[in-house]
Amino acid sequence: MDFVHDQLATGRKIRVLTIVDTFSRFSPAVDPRFSYRGEDVVLTLERICKTVGYPRTIRVDQGSEFISRDLDILAYQKGVVLDFSRPGKPTDNSFIESFNGKFRSKCLNTHWFLSLDDARQKMEDWRRDYNEVRPHSAIGNKAPISL
């Protein structure tokens, strides 16, 4: 998990929580909001894990939303290990950084977001294409949904 920053056409800043499975490259969520706290990360995880289940491990950086008490409690309750990357070492979480680069170049840089709802819809459309249509060389030129 990681965050990407962008803005609406009005200039109002948004933060997007990006989540990717390192094995299948499947992205269960890209979730834009005006602000994020630890409890917001937990709400997003609980929503998506109802569908895809809880992972064994979640790799995150040292951001305040990820070192929060809320996320720590959820991880403890669900038996999930939080694997923190070393401060200042984005290569420790290279899968999500690669995903974020594709997300920025193919979605964020190609759209104007007129509202948060507009951003949510355009990002969801991109995420579905990424998961269901786009072949990934790292997984044998298959779409992540096929794994």
Name every feature range the model reports, one short phrase each:
Residues M1-L147:
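Charged DNA-binding/catalytic regions of mobile-element recombinases
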